[in-house]
Amino acid sequence: MLESEESVMILKKPDSLTYPGTSFCPGCAHGISDRIIAESVEALGMREKFIPTVDVACGAWSMDIWDFDTVMCAHGRPMAVAAGIKRARPDALVAAYLGDGAAYSIGTAETVHCALRNENIVAIVLNNGVFGMTGGQMAPTTLPGQKTASSVKGRDPKTQGGVFDIVKTIGYMDIAYLARAALDSPAGIIKAQKYIQ
């Protein structure tokens, strides 16, 4: 760059991301989602009022990365805890951040009942189709034919059941907002960030 040229920063780390490394597996989308959540919260001017909830699965590592007052919950319970926080702190922006195993397996009741009550929280679920933290076993969201540690020949719906689809499960309910995005491309990441904001 020439000295006379003016440099313009077009992308920087959000102030609410503090940890330079990651504990996430290679290829995992948690790091991407952590960043777009931080960018979205800052863009909304809600950094001091944002309270995310996470559980003991992979999303818990976000506590090492975010500079937010984050609440650690039992596995599958971030939505229920987020609902309680929002009722106690109605001025806060409260989000439940969890994986598909937590939201659609052990936390199915919390997910469905928060939707039935139309709780005023943001729920962000990362669906990778497996139980990632415990070794990649089949999850309720594992697709037919998808190979996992516990479905080595691929998921067979005849013997292992169908796939859990959150949109089909709660899409008919009177909820404020429901969206699905993929973090597999720059366009998908931009779309997801717009959904979050």
Give each language-model segment a name.
Residues 8-74:
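Active-site diphosphate/adenylate-binding microenvironment
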Residues 51-55, 96, 123-126, 178-182:
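General beta-strand structural signal in soluble alpha/beta enzymes
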Residues 58-132, 194:
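Thiamine diphosphate
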Residues 41-48, 60, 89, 161, ...:
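Structural signal for hydrophobic packing residues in well-ordered secondary-structure cores
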Residues 106-117, 126, 130-197:
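Glycine-rich ThDP/TPP pyrophosphate-binding loop and its adjacent helix/strand module
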